[in-house]
């Protein structure tokens, strides 16, 4: 994978000022971003998150998922600590793209769960790839993370690229009546660690 650094700038946010680092995957043409705060290249484990793009949750305030809540929670946690990094990865809809995500939502409106909808469209349950994280983190001087995630697949992916996950930090935000079924599916079918509220819970309509 050929991921190259392009530019960096300051990014003031309601949580504090971050540095925004832009990267280009020359093979896919996708543009990824890292937001950093503080000295993250000192060798100590860094509070961090891998956040896949979710236009509906991150920008359009959708309650169908917990993505926007997790994004805000991660940035707030980094700002509170004064040190950390968030990789914003252009992998909309667990890797199937925005329009296919809307198609999947249409199937979910008809009764399918989030995994069934992907499979009915001919996709895997989760098509995301985290290979781009290794060169992005290497550029930033980060080799060890305290990873904010509920997804064990992210932990395994980073470790496969020789990035140490010193700690998994749970990030549970935004449960509501619109996403309860979705989160139950992530726990029951995708193995997400969401606590007793969802773990092993079967979906009900």
UniProtKB/Swiss-Prot annotation:
Pathway: Cofactor biosynthesis; riboflavin biosynthesis; 5-amino-6-(D-ribitylamino)uracil from GTP: step 1/4. Zn(2+) binds at residues 54, 65, 67. Keywords: GTP-binding, Hydrolase, Metal-binding, Nucleotide-binding, Riboflavin biosynthesis, Zinc. Binds 1 zinc ion per subunit. It catalyses: GTP + 4 H2O = 2,5-diamino-6-hydroxy-4-(5-phosphoribosylamino)-pyrimidine + formate + 2 phosphate + 3 H(+). PANTHER family: 3,4-DIHYDROXY-2-BUTANONE 4-PHOSPHATE SYNTHASE (PTHR21327:SF18), GTP CYCLOHYDROLASE II-RELATED (PTHR21327). Catalyzes the conversion of GTP to 2,5-diamino-6-ribosylamino-4(3H)-pyrimidinone 5'-phosphate (DARP), formate and pyrophosphate. Belongs to the GTP cyclohydrolase II family. This is GTP cyclohydrolase-2. It comes from Pseudomonas aeruginosa (strain UCBPP-PA14). The gene is ribA.
